Curated annotation (Swiss-Prot):
Keywords: Cytoplasm, Methyltransferase, RNA-binding, rRNA processing, S-adenosyl-L-methionine, Transferase. Its EC number is 2.1.1.176. GO terms for cellular component: cytosol. It catalyses: cytidine(967) in 16S rRNA + S-adenosyl-L-methionine = 5-methylcytidine(967) in 16S rRNA + S-adenosyl-L-homocysteine + H(+). Gene3D superfamilies: Helix hairpin bin, NusB-like, Sun protein, domain 3, Vaccinia Virus protein VP39. It comes from Yersinia enterocolitica serotype O:8 / biotype 1B (strain NCTC 13174 / 8081). It is found in: Cytoplasm. PROSITE patterns: NOL1_NOP2_SUN, SAM_MT_RSMB_NOP. This is Ribosomal RNA small subunit methyltransferase B. The active site is at C375. InterPro entries: MeTrfase_RsmB-F_NOP2_cat (IPR049560), MeTrfase_RsmB-F_NOP2_dom (IPR001678), NusB-like_sf (IPR035926), NusB_RsmB_TIM44 (IPR006027), RCMT (IPR023267), rRNA_ssu_MeTfrase_B (IPR004573), rRNA_ssu_MeTfrase_B_ent (IPR023541), RsmB-like_ferredoxin (IPR054728).
Length: 429
């Protein structure tokens, strides 16, 4: 049966909601995916994520092909053309099908009179494709990052910035966390092999497994039974550093969507975990993950800056603070971050992080452990944050994490490894 919807127009609307309304793809896509087939959901995701990943290149190409930009109510058609260009450059969709479906998107968006224009622009691109892409490769658009972020990455990593950009611009690997309550990693790797799913263990993180080719979670052995969770390898490092022990009181702050909460409980099933997040809607994901893995935690809504409101005078043996951050380490998973973030956000986020860590530190028992973590690669949110905290608190000791960074561990995104992530392990004397 022929679809009653046009996927390219849906993708253009999603991109408009990100770029013009400041919404994240993870917020926008679930609602749009409800009305389309399972098969088309994957393609919609590819069109949206892919277009946003290479946005500057597509924008530059359109500037060469059109005398005037499409603005105002016609802006969504600008994004429709982008979706068309993305298909022609980056997908295996036959060009005639990509063109036909994209042009038809104008009808779905109730402006059939623009079909001729869209068709003309895309066909002109086809004729000039080789030349345009060669020229695009020789200007700043080929970095595929906003100029402010490019400048910050170059400053922080003068010898590694190009590798970081390259990793950010690639599709992310799919990492799993094996639930040690059900199987050892070796046992689960054998189950994957039996299911004809190629996978490799991580060299450093004991529960992490990388799939050679990403697959649907429904294809993973025992996913619904809680045998495994999809979680990046670097994110798994938080709980390895935290090292929870049975019988302890543990706080997981900024806990949503629950990957680290459940990892704590898999590592030490007899701990008591309080999982707190300011976003009530995202906390529902924590509950869903706990339910699938058949684990239990105390889940509460709360602001990290005001802990007395949600835990009173309770103190904890260990605290995991996965602080709100710029998410510059996970751009390959969320390419919309590049266009939603602003340079001014970094100082604001650093201030918020400072307020949270100051407010929560008194809740850690003497002799207790706090792991401060972010999915950022920017020093202002990481090493500099911890350096100023240590200056303020003589009773805090930084534990050596065995890595390059003198103040904590800074992972950088890598095509065959984890995301960009930072951890610092602190002990209260």
């Amino acid at each position: 049966m022929k679809n009653t919807y046009n996927l390219r127009s849906i993708a253009a609307k999603a991109i408009s909601q990100v770029l013009d309304q400041g919404q994240s793809l993870s917020t926008v896509l679930p609602g749009l995916q409800k009305s389309i087939s399972d098969k088309d959901r994957a393609l919609l995701q590819e069109l949206c994520f892919g277009t946003l990943r290479v946005l500057p290149q597509l924008e530059w190409c359109i500037q060469q092909l059109m005398a005037r930009p499409m603005t105002g109510k016609q802006r969504v058609f600008h994004y429709l053309i982008m979706v068309g260009l993305y298909q022609l450059i980056y997908t295996r969709i036959p060009p005639h099908a990509a063109l036909a479906e994209t042009v038809e998107g104008a009808t779905a968006l109730k402006r059939p009179q623009l079909k001729g224009l869209i068709n003309g622009v895309l066909r002109q691109f086809q004729r000039q494709q080789v030349e345009l892409l060669e020229r695009a490769a020789n200007n700043d658009s080929h970095y595929l990052h906003p100029s402010w972020l490019l400048a910050r990455i170059k400053l922080a990593y003068p010898d590694q910035w190009q590798q970081i950009l390259d990793a950010n611009n690639q599709k992310p690997p799919m990492w799993l966390r094996v639930n040690r309550l059900h199987h050892s990693r070796i046992e689960y790797l054998e189950l994957l092999k039996q299911a004809n799913i190629e996978a490799l263990p991580h060299d450093f993180y004991p529960d992490a497994v990388r799939l050679i080719t990403p697959c649907a979670v429904s294809d993973l052995p025992g996913f619904e039974l809680g045998w495994v969770t999809v979680q990046d390898a670097s994110a798994q490092g938080c709980v390895d550093l935290l090292d929870p022990q049975d019988g302890e009181q543990i706080l997981d702050l900024c806990a949503a969507p629950g990957g680290k909460t459940t990892h704590i409980l898999e590592a030490a099933p007899k701990v008591h975990v309080l999982a707190v997040d300011i976003d009530e809607q995202r906390l529902s994901r924590v509950k869903e993950n706990l339910q699938r893995l058949r684990l239990h935690a105390d889940v509460r809504v709360g602001d990290g800056r005001t802990p007395d409101e949600w835990c009173g005078d309770q103190q904890f043996d260990r605290i995991l603070l996965d602080a709100p951050c710029s998410a510059t380490g996970v751009i390959r998973r969320h390419p919309d971050i590049k266009w939603l973030r602003r340079d001014s956000d970094i100082a604001e986020l650093a201030q918020l992080q400072s307020e949270i860590i100051e407010a929560i530190w008194p809740k850690l028992k003497k002799g207790g452990v706090m792991v401060y973590a972010t999915c950022s690669i920017l020093p202002e949110e990481n090493q500099q944050q911890i350096a100023t905290f240590l200056q303020r608190h003589s009773e805090a000791d930084l534990v050596e994490t065995g890595t390059v960074s003198a103040l904590g561990r800074q992972n950088l995104p890598h095509p065959e490894d984890g995301d960009g992530f930072y951890y610092a392990k602190l002990i209260k004397r």
